[in-house]
Every structure is written in structure tokens, then in C-alpha cells.
């Protein structure tokens, strides 16, 4: 029964992603029909203005697929490592930590390339994840969902104040950082795709390899240790994969919130907690969600556009509140 549900969910997710891909290419300041999109993708028919529009939008769509998949898988890994349903790069303050290191790089080292952003974002995200989990673990009951959310909010607020302190004195730094901070895939190019793709492949392969150990970890630290699992090593590898996926995407697209929260949580409700199924489905679902958000941003903001990070925040904030209410977590 569960296998049948998984197959149906996977088929529906893939169909949804294909639709979002076509919509992402078709919609914009100049709308293009689906038949034209399909002909252009396969280089059928004559060279027209519409075909050129389609070809110009393909990099944005491909980058959106990689970015959405990376953020969603990162969220699934963080939820599994912390055994916490609300773990997410944005809620845990990881995005803000990456932002702080990036703005420091812009202000003090005058960096301006995505390849340089990536390693700064990775360092900031990793240090923030360790800090937040350490703060949430203080006191009884360990890192509960509410304590993680509070620690993430506190760390995020403190780090954001540092971001503002570094950014505000310089108009040039502010201008360069401001557009990046909103979270957007609109300016993506094939160069960005070539930068992001290796990190996605490495992070995704490591996450798939960690699926079985993470299933064992879900039984609890003591039970997992009794079954022969190296718990610290499992957490370390899974966390590194999650931070790598999140940081590389954040460096190139800016901080995009709630993708890593909504998608894995939804699939966990539908197909259960098996990470072997959740991780690949999260990749497909995250890609579809980010493309949907990007497309809606273009439609709602026409003739301009809303950044995809704003749209995901508008969708994700109510979902976050519903998850918190459903969890009914009262312990601090």
C-alpha cells in the first residue's frame, strides 16, 4: 500500500514539475503558448521572436529546478538530523548567517562573483547551524521544536543586526547586497548553473547515501547506537550535505525562505518518514514549488515582477504557523 502511494505521489510530483517548467518558460512580460514552448525546446519550426524568448528563459528555469531541489533536500536533511519537523534554513537562521558572511565579503574584500559568494555562504551557514543547535540544546529536553525556533529567531535577529551594521555605512555595498538579499532567480545564467550544479550533485549524492542511516537515526540516539550506527558521524555528514546545498543556492540566488520547510513536511505526511523516499520526492517537489513561486511573482507583479523569495515567504509563513499549531509543542 505504501509503495503504491509512493509511486502515485512520485508520478503526480513529476507531472506537476513538468507543468511548472512549461509555465515558467511560457509566462512573463511576453507570454508564449505551450505549443510554441515545446517546439522551441526541441528546435522545431522556424526562428521567431517567441522562440528567442523561450531560449532566453531556459537558464532561469533550469536554475530554478536546481535551486528549489537544493533547498528542499537541505530542509529534509535538517529535519532528519534534528528530528524536528520545523527545521529549515530560514527558520534556523542559517540563511542569515550566510548573508552576514556574504555582506562582509562584499564590504571588506570587494567580492562580486558567485563563485566567491559560495564559500563565504557555506562558512556562515555552517557556523550558524552549529550555534543555533547548541543554543537550543541548553537545558532540559534537548533541542525541542520550539527551542530550535526561538534559538533560530534569536540568532537570526542578532546576525541581521550585524548585517545592517556592515551594510548601511556604504551605499555601494548596500546596493550590491540589497538585490541579492531578497532572494530571486530572475538573473540566473548558464554560468550560475555551471557553478551550482556540482554542489547540487555532491550534496544530493551524499544525502541519498545517508538516507538509510538517517532512517536508523530516527529511532533515537540510543537505539541507533545499539544497532551499530555511528551517530555523530551520521549527523556530521548529513549536516554538511544540507549546509552545502543550502549555502551554494543562497550564495547564487539569495536567501529564499520556507521551501525546505514546506515540501519535506508535506511528503512526510503523505508517504511517511522513510528518507529513501522523502529525499528524491523533496528534490522534485522543491523544484516545482520554486518554479511556481517564480512564475506567480512574474504574473502578480506584471509588468515588473515579485522576487521568488517574497512569494515563497507569503506561502510559507501560514504553513509554518499551521505546523507549529499541529505539533502542539509546549515544552521549552
Locate the predicted segments by residue.
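Alpha-helical transmembrane segments in inner-membrane proteins
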Residues: 1-332
Amino acid at each position: 500500500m505504501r509503495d503504491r502511494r509512493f509511486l502515485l505521489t512520485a508520478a503526480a510530483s513529476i507531472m506537476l514539475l513538468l507543468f511548472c517548467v512549461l509555465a515558467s518558460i511560457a509566462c512573463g512580460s511576453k507570454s508564449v503558448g505551450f505549443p510554441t514552448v515545446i517546439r522551441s525546446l526541441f528546435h522545431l519550426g522556424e526562428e521567431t521572436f517567441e522562440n528567442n524568448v523561450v531560449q532566453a528563459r531556459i537558464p532561469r528555469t533550469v536554475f530554478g529546478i536546481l535551486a528549489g531541489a537544493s533547498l528542499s533536500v537541505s530542509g529534509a536533511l535538517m529535519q532528519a538530523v534534528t528530528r524536528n519537523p520545523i527545521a529549515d534554513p530560514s527558520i534556523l537562521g542559517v540563511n542569515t548567517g550566510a548573508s552576514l558572511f556574504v555582506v562582509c565579503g562584499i564590504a571588506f574584500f570587494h567580492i562580486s562573483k558567485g563563485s566567491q559568494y559560495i564559500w563565504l555562504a557555506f562558512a556562515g551557514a555552517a557556523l550558524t547551524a552549529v550555534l543555533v543547535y547548541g543554543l537550543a540544546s541548553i537545558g532540559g529536553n534537548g533541542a525541542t521544536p520550539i527551542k530550535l525556533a526561538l534559538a533560530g529567531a534569536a540568532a537570526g535577529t542578532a546576525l541581521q543586526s550585524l548585517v545592517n551594521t556592515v551594510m548601511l555605512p556604504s551605499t555601494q555595498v548596500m546596493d550590491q547586497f540589497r538585490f541579492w538579499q531578497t532572494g530571486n532567480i530572475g538573473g540566473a545564467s548558464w554560468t550560475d548553473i555551471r557553478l551550482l550544479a556540482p554542489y547540487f550533485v555532491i550534496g544530493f549524492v551524499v544525502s541519498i547515501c545517508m538516507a538509510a542511516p538517517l532512517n536508523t537515526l530516527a529511532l533515537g540516539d540510543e537505539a541507533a547506537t545499539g544497532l551499530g550506527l555511528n551517530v555523530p558521524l551520521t549527523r556530521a555528514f548529513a549536516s554538511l550535505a544540507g549546509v552545502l546545498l543550502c549555502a551554494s543556492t543562497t550564495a547564487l540566488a539569495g536567501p529564499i525562505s520556507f521551501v525546505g520547510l514546506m515540501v519535506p513536511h508535506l511528503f512526510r505526511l503523505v508517504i511517511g518518514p522513510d528518507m529513501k523516499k522523502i529525499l528524491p520526492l523533496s528534490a522534485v517537489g522543491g523544484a516545482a514549488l520554486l518554479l511556481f513561486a517564480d512564475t506567480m511573482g512574474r504574473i502578480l507583479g506584471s509588468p515588473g515582477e515579485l522576487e521568488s523569495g517574497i512569494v515563497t515567504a507569503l506561502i510559507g509563513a501560514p504553513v509554518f504557523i499551521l505546523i507549529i499549531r499541529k505539533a502542539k509543542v509546549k515544552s521549552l
